[in-house]
Amino acid sequence: MSELFWFEKYRPRSFDEVVDLEEVKARLREFVRGGNMPHLLFYGPPGTGKTTMALVLARELYGEYWRENTLELNASDERGINVIRERVKEFARTAPVGKAPFKLVILDEADNMTSDAQQALRRIMEMYAQNTRFILLANYISGIIEPIQSRTVMIRFSPLPKEAVFARLRYIADNEGVKISDDALEAIYEFTQGDMRRAINALQIAATTGKEITEETVAKALGMVSPRLLRETLNDAFRGNFGKAATQIYGFVVDGGIGELEIVKQLHREALKLDVPEYLKPEIAYIIAEAHYAILRGAHGLTQIYGALAKIRKLLKYTASI
């Protein structure tokens, strides 16, 4: 297996290599065909392809000269808007290499900038608009001021569907000579929730345990409870075998070294998959959220988990008797 970070090793280099995101690719291909584009704002959760798509667009626009014509900046890494201004000024001062009509600045984590810094960024974008285009990357659109939103074409990135994540993980596993079970893929997806970067990183971590990845090896490598074991524990608790369920949860924490907060997060996901009336699920979610909040405030983790399971059991038992 390669010692490189797999997420970087297998980062797509062209539109054709990008999984899913068909509508986004179609819009960006039009910009490439036209040879021009506006400022862009890519927004959406982490790991949904924003940085990858920005770099792919740079490669498609500039070909072999993409590095010379592209400046990557991270708003949280830079020492302030003055540093960004100076770097953009120096970058935009020279003409694009090749036949490109403009250069490209990719600014990650733009939503981490203060409002004042974003106002200054807006002026920088206007000042160098003649020969420079900006792609701003943000997790939260609410973190971007309206004057910047109005000067960009905004493109939303959503969490990737399970099928797309599975296909990419299988491709990487095959290339690295690793076997992975369907249950292991499910466990990775449960842990990462459509975040492709985290999913690939999780795959690489799990692969360090051997040439075959199972649900159990994923759980152990990522510090989570096996989803199968957690479902069995929930079923025990809700069928009234509370002593067995409590013993299992105690083992997850004490023997397995899994944090109570991680268990609560998994409980939330698994409990909402229960075959119960839909109107009960908000109540179940609220019970688990109360336990989560109490643990964050310093309450005893195991006690809160036991209490949440008992409340859910009581709720299910009561509604079944109506």
UniProtKB/Swiss-Prot annotation:
Record CDD domains: AAA, HLD_clamp_RFC
Annotated ATP binding sites: G44, P45, P46, G47, T48, G49, K50, T51
UniProt keyword terms in alphabetical order: ATP-binding, DNA replication, Nucleotide-binding
Domain of life: Archaea
An annotated GO cellular component: DNA replication factor C complex
Gene Ontology MF term list: ATP binding; ATP hydrolysis activity; DNA binding; DNA clamp loader activity
Gene Ontology annotations of biological process type: DNA repair; DNA-templated DNA replication
Signal peptide region: none
One Pfam family linked to the record: AAA
Gene3D superfamilies, per database record: 1.10.8.60, 1.20.272.10, P-loop containing nucleotide triphosphate hydrolases (3.40.50.300)
InterPro entries the record matches: AAA+_ATPase, ATPase_AAA_core, DNA_pol3_clamp-load_cplx_C, DNA_Rep/Repair_Clamp_Loader, P-loop_NTPase, Rep_factor-C_ssu_arc, Rep_factorC_C, RFC_lid
Function as written in the Swiss-Prot or TrEMBL entry: Part of the RFC clamp loader complex which loads the PCNA sliding clamp onto DNA.
Record text on subunit structure and interactions: Heteromultimer composed of small subunits (RfcS) and large subunits (RfcL).
Family statement: Belongs to the activator 1 small subunits family. RfcS subfamily.
Classification via NCBIfam families: PRK00440.1
HAMAP family found in the cross-reference section: RfcS
Protein name per Swiss-Prot or TrEMBL: Replication factor C small subunit 2
Organism: Pyrobaculum arsenaticum (strain DSM 13514 / JCM 11321 / PZ6)
